[in-house]
């Protein structure tokens, strides 16, 4: 396992780090841990063309986190196996809940924020589609 963190979070710098990882002969998978990092992985792949969803055929499996249009397109076309998306509706709900509780002097606790795995087979599902924002 190798972890790479660029000095700044830009698609270009994430792409440089991802290219270094994807160029290694023994690379079997890569994860972009946020929208910028995932888009960096995809930008790196534009030069290398190693990502896909068929590990048995030698593809490097790519997975991302978030749901911007670039990541969704990569999931739809099979460049990424899938990605994890957040629930913006529930994040906003819990933010308002916490703000109201704080304004009323109540003690705050950690709140859950759900994440959902999506791939090309479930992007239109009732539970997933509302969370695939741009």
Task: Give, region by region, the residue ranges found by the protein language model.
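Short, structured loop/turn "capping" segments at alpha-beta junctions
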Residues: 1-2, 27
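Short beta-strand-to-loop elements that line the ligand-binding cleft
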Residues: 2-6, 63, 85
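Short beta-strand elements at the ligand-binding edges of bilobed clamshell
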Residues: 77-89
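Hydrophobic alpha-helical
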Residues: 7-73
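Hinge/cleft segment of the Venus flytrap/periplasmic-binding protein
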Residues: 87-134
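Short, glycine/charged-enriched secondary-structure capping and boundary segments
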Residues: 44-47, 76-78, 98, 132-133
